[in-house]
Amino acid sequence: MYVEYRHEGGFEYFFNKMAKKTVAVMYDVNTKPYALQIINEMQSRGTSILPVYYSDEELVPTEDKCEYAYQMAADADYVLAVGSGTLNDMAKSVSTRRDIPCGVLATAASMDGYCSKGAALMRDGFKVTDMVHTPEDVLIDLDIVRSAPGIMTAAGFGDIIGKYTCLMDWKLAHIVKGEDIHEQAFSLMEQARAECVNAFDGLVKNESGAIAKLMNALITAGTSMAICGNSRPASGSEHHQSHFLEMDFVRRGEKIPLHGLKVAIGTLVSIELYHYLKDQNIKFDGSREVFALIEKMPSAETLKAMLLKMGCPVRFSELGVRRETMEEMLEKAYTVRDRYTILTLIHELGLTKEIAPLILSKYY
């Protein structure tokens, strides 16, 4: 994988690489201006373009949408997504099915899946994660990323603070269940998260250097997952809550809130659950070691204050989640993935109904 930032000459490495090739460029109504710009730049250097355009205001990666791109890319040597989450996942899926490389021109610092081996797609109304090619190229124009709506940057930051709980969940699984931890992947994600959080004041001001730190953390999530061969470094209980809610939005045919916004609130919920165990001194195998780690975690209130400064919602009701859906999420989100997290532990301890009123009062 090669990460290239735009300089005065554009993306010279990428443009030279694509000269005389045929590239399927996937974009939608929101990313059309950036797609047309890079299409013109590539065509001027001898690249043939197969445009794959979606007019959807809110693109959902359903089977028919992916099939359209697959058919349009029949003669392509390469697939380039111009967008963020959905378009990137769809391009990776098409790339894998066609067995050709892919890349992405990132249009927002909104999510952490740019470089992951997983593609989140909708199949029969359910969210599934397919194993796919990782992008060969990630193109970043900080002017484009900074011009994205602030709520998208807030979503990206929400995805990164989710690394507090997913890494803690990994430690929990190691202590309680003996699950192996890939130290390199863990450390890479932990360091990138720290650098991003340390740049928080600059993020609030939308400064280029801080946005670059956020993008680096988002990209590191993908590379750390690739290193260890699974999504543990980037996805835990906070993501399972998000996935559960996302499937409910799809079933109801409603607009899906940005992934990172759901993850951000899920992070607050998970941290609240961790601190509840410690504050109530609830015993379980390995509890002493887990409690020592909880002491090092930021409080939910600290992260909540940061999210509010970023303009991020801090209650699920602000995202249009129904109260009964959140109640169901607290009971069932641990089943979304076969992965041990704080949600699993709370379920095993029989504490879900006991703690639900507190969580609902704070985060609904």
Roles of regions detected by a PLM:
Residues 44, 74, 137-150, 158-170, ...:
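Generic secondary-structure signature for well-ordered alpha-helical cores
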Residues 186-306:
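Active-site segments that bind and position negatively charged phosphate/pyrophosphate groups
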Residues 160, 276-364:
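C-terminal charged capping/lid subdomain of soluble metabolic enzymes
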Residues 1-78:
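ATP/NTP phosphate-donor binding region
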Residues 7, 28-35, 84-88, 110, ...:
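Gly/Ser/Thr-rich loops at beta-strand to alpha-helix junctions
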Residues 73-94, 98-108:
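A short, small-residue-rich loop immediately preceding and capping a beta-strand
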Residues 96-195:
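A glycine/threonine-rich phosphate-anchoring loop and its flanking beta-alpha core
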